[in-house]
Each structure stands twice: as structure tokens, then as C-alpha cells.
Amino acid sequence: MKLSPATKSFIGKTVDISTFAIQWGFVPFVVYLGFKKGAEPMPNGQILPLSAMSLLWG
């Protein structure tokens, strides 16, 4: 299938713009999702007693 030069140029520009948007938009998007969801609840600080029996049989 032959593509005209205008179509090739359009596809090239589209790929360039998409690459730019993905490269520069990924980190801000992840930060946005982190702020939107919020932090996980903090642990209550309770110290669990560990022994060989609790490690083996829960």
C-alpha cells in the first residue's frame, strides 16, 4: 500500500506528538492519581510478638 507524502508526514507528526505527550505526561499523571486516591492508612504501631511457633503456624 502506497502512502502519499502528506499521509506519511501526518503519521510522523502524530507519532512525535504522542511520544512527547507520553514522555512528559506520565509522571504528572501518576502524581495526580496518588493525590486523588490519597495515602494508605498508617499502621497503628502495634508490635506483634514473633516466635518460631508464630512464624511457622501463624
Swiss-Prot record:
<dbReference type="InterPro" id="IPR012621">
    <property type="entry name" value="Tom7"/>
</dbReference>
<protein>
    <recommendedName>
        <fullName>Mitochondrial import receptor subunit TOM7 homolog</fullName>
    </recommendedName>
</protein>
<keyword id="KW-0813">Transport</keyword>
<dbReference type="GO" id="GO:0005742">
    <property type="term" value="C:mitochondrial outer membrane translocase complex"/>
</dbReference>
<keyword id="KW-0812">Transmembrane</keyword>
<dbReference type="GO" id="GO:0030150">
    <property type="term" value="P:protein import into mitochondrial matrix"/>
</dbReference>
<keyword id="KW-1000">Mitochondrion outer membrane</keyword>
<dbReference type="Pfam" id="PF08038">
    <property type="entry name" value="Tom7"/>
</dbReference>
<keyword id="KW-0653">Protein transport</keyword>
<dbReference type="GO" id="GO:0007005">
    <property type="term" value="P:mitochondrion organization"/>
</dbReference>
<feature type="transmembrane region" description="Helical">
    <location>
        <begin position="17"/>
        <end position="35"/>
    </location>
</feature>
<comment type="subunit">
    <text>Forms part of the preprotein translocase complex of the outer mitochondrial membrane (TOM complex).</text>
</comment>
<keyword id="KW-0472">Membrane</keyword>
<comment type="similarity">
    <text>Belongs to the Tom7 family.</text>
</comment>
<dbReference type="GO" id="GO:1903955">
    <property type="term" value="P:positive regulation of protein targeting to mitochondrion"/>
</dbReference>
<feature type="topological domain" description="Cytoplasmic">
    <location>
        <begin position="1"/>
        <end position="16"/>
    </location>
</feature>
<keyword id="KW-0496">Mitochondrion</keyword>
<feature type="topological domain" description="Mitochondrial intermembrane">
    <location>
        <begin position="36"/>
        <end position="58"/>
    </location>
</feature>
<keyword id="KW-1133">Transmembrane helix</keyword>
